[in-house]
């Protein structure tokens, strides 16, 4: 933590700068009413007008039309849901899968209390938090990669 030096108001150079208005926030243009009352509404209304104009002028559909009677064989979620999908896919009891998903944020909330005595920001001086981060990242990557594979190879990633 750095030590901030208090300004010496008896210094003639500083007094001259302050007399000219330097060192204060009196430069530029005030945010009220110029920005907040005039510029921001113009930008917001212009953005809305552009979106409405594009929707009216080009009402094309995005992607293929949905067919509820023809579903794909393997439905995969978005990539950021792969670890959660893998947990739900491999655990036989769905209640246990939901409890495992709830335990992840609950476990992350306990990490600051495990090392609350340690005030360092260097990760090498906080071994518990660093270990939890590295193991959690490895498990999330393992589960995420496994979710893209068939169920028989998903836990071992086809390595074993």
UniProtKB/Swiss-Prot annotation:
It is a multi-pass membrane protein. Keywords: Chloroplast, Electron transport, Membrane, Photosynthesis, Plastid, Thylakoid, Transmembrane, Transmembrane helix, Transport. Coiled coil: none annotated. It holds the Pfam family Cytochrom_B_C. GO terms for molecular function: electron transporter, transferring electrons within cytochrome b6/f complex of photosystem II activity; electron transporter, transferring electrons within the cyclic electron transport pathway of photosynthesis activity; oxidoreductase activity. The keyword Cell division does not apply. The keyword Ribonucleoprotein does not apply. One of its GO terms (cellular component) is chloroplast thylakoid membrane. InterPro entries: Cyt_b/b6_C, Cyt_b/b6_C_sf, Cyt_b6/f_cplx_suIV, Cytochrome_b_C_euk/bac. GO terms for biological process: photosynthetic electron transport chain. It is found in: Plastid, Chloroplast thylakoid membrane. The chain crosses the membrane at residues 36-56, 95-115, 131-151. The 4 large subunits of the cytochrome b6-f complex are cytochrome b6, subunit IV (17 kDa polypeptide, petD), cytochrome f and the Rieske protein, while the 4 small subunits are petG, petL, petM and petN. The complex functions as a dimer. Belongs to the cytochrome b family. PetD subfamily. Component of the cytochrome b6-f complex, which mediates electron transfer between photosystem II (PSII) and photosystem I (PSI), cyclic electron flow around PSI, and state transitions. A longer mRNA that is not produced by splicing has been shown to be transcribed in barley and maize; it can also be predicted for this organism. It is not known if this mRNA is translated. This is Cytochrome b6-f complex subunit 4. It comes from Lactuca sativa (Garden lettuce).
């Amino acid at each position: 933590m750095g030590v901030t030096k208090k300004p010496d108001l008896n210094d003639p150079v500083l007094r001259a700068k302050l007399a000219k208005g330097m060192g204060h926030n009196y430069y530029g243009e005030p945010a009220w009413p110029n920005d907040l009352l005039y510029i921001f509404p113009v930008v917001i209304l212009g953005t809305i007008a552009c979106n409405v104009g594009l929707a009216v002028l080009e009402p094309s559909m995005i992607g293929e039309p949905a067919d509820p009677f023809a579903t794909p064989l393997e439905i995969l979620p978005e990539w950021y849901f792969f670890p959660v999908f893998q947990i739900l896919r491999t655990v036989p009891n769905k209640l246990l899968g939901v409890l495992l998903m709830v335990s992840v944020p609950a476990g992350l909330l306990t990490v600051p209390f495990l090392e609350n005595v340690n005030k360092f920001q260097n990760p090498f001086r906080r071994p518990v938090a660093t270990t939890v981060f590295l193991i959690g990242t490895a498990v999330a990557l393992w589960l995420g990669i496994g979710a893209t594979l068939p169920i028989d190879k998903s836990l071992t990633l086809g390595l074993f």
